[in-house]
């Protein structure tokens, strides 16, 4: 019985890992950001865009501690680094 449970847990963990890899982990986990981060400012430096759209030129997805409303993510002005 313990072997079956261990196999099932490995399968579930593998499925979650593959799902994260397929999504590219480009978008942050909003629950983590809301707990530990700060809200996106919606200014010229950073603003929210719909989840399945791209950041405009000269902007990129913000670091992981920025969050927006549900189904949106934060774009920040590209720093050039």
UniProtKB/Swiss-Prot annotation:
Recorded GO MF terms: toxin activity
Source organism superkingdom: Eukaryota
Compartmental location: Secreted; Nematocyst
GO CC term, one of those recorded: nematocyst
Keyword Transcription included in the entry's annotation: no
Main localization category: secreted
Signal peptide segment: 1-23
Keywords of the record: Cleavage on pair of basic residues, Disulfide bond, Nematocyst, Neurotoxin, Secreted, Signal, Toxin
Post-translational modification: Contains 4 disulfide bonds.
Chain residues in the propeptide: 24-25
Transit peptide found in the keyword field: no
Family: Belongs to the Cnidaria small cysteine-rich protein (SCRiP) family. beta subfamily.
Role noted for this protein: Induces neurotoxic symptoms on zebrafish. Has also been claimed to be implied in calcification, but tests on homolog proteins suggest that proteins of this family have a neurotoxic function and not a calcification function.
Name of the protein described by the UniProt record: Small cysteine-rich protein 6
